[in-house]
Amino acid sequence: MTTDATRSEQIRQTVDRNFRLSVHSSFLDPYLPKALHNFTALKHPRLKFKVFAHLFRHLKLKPLSEELSQHPYCDFLDLSPQQWSTFKNLLGALYFLDEVKTTIGYFKKKLLLELISEKGYDFALHRGNLYAPILKTIAIPPLNGELEQRIHAVGKFLTEYLWTQQPEPLIQRFVLKFNNKSTWNFQHVIDPHLQQQLFNICRHLLKETEVF
């Protein structure tokens, strides 16, 4: 019969394994501890419920044993390496969405938001199009400050995950202006089989956190 110490060590090794197997490093990595803490601390309980509903539905996760379910990071123990990498980035995105929410007023005051078609943005937003706030976010020029760069990065991250979902992406209807006067070069950055589930999860991230 295994002891409590042995079970705790097994759980620790499982968590460490998932971290090691997260093969895709990104700008989000340094902020994952806080994102994980916020998530496990039920900072957004409704969001947590909906995200996991999508994870279990689309990623086909197996229920955890009662023993493992007592661990503070139990929600992440059964993720495959690919699933863990995906979910890790989504948690990072949740953390950055909070930053966007608390700092967008600063950018508005500094007149750093530039959209060629403000009328077009308002039309999309009033129609409930969830791409609009993302477009608004990435319209922030990536200035020299670390905070500005991170806010710009989350817009890039979310847009690259979401823009491929529509036959005629909203992004094509906008011209974004940056300091270098260039337009954005979008690419397919994820496995096509993951796009729909990521879209669903990100949609709930945006709705539940009510950014903007």
Identify the role of each PLM range.
Residues M1-F212:
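General marker for long, soluble alpha-helical cores
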